[in-house]
Amino acid sequence: LATDITEFKVCNDKVYLSPVLDLFNREIISYSISLSPNLQQVKDMLSGLFAKMPDTARPVFHSDQGWQYQHAEYQRLLAEHNITQSMSRKGNCMDNGAMENFFGRLKVEMFYGEQFETVEDFIHALDEYIYYYNNERISLKLKGMSPVQYRTHSKAS
């Protein structure tokens, strides 16, 4: 698993996305959207992750060294759910390359060059894109399947 936070400038405001990327199939398994990059946003993202995570799971969860991921509350929540924290080396964005790749693809495919009337319109478009990305957008790395199709196919095999 990997996470990070990215910023969008929309209608003279800023919108922040905090997703969880499953490195097995590149599925976004939880995310939160906020108008400020605060600890509550990260806790909301974690709540979504915990709700979907099997009790027996013991994942490694990678992030950069952002202040949210160094916060004692964040680290406590991970430990309570048997998640091992992993952090990038200082100043090395390539350590979290899968997450950076997702953000780049997201911005090229649904943000750059687009005009949104309101922040709410943008958030709706972001929700729709994440659904599309997980369920419809195919990837050659996933044998021509979407992330959800690949996960489902792998479980059936």
Positions of PLM-derived features:
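Charged DNA-binding/catalytic regions of mobile-element recombinases
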Residues: 1-157
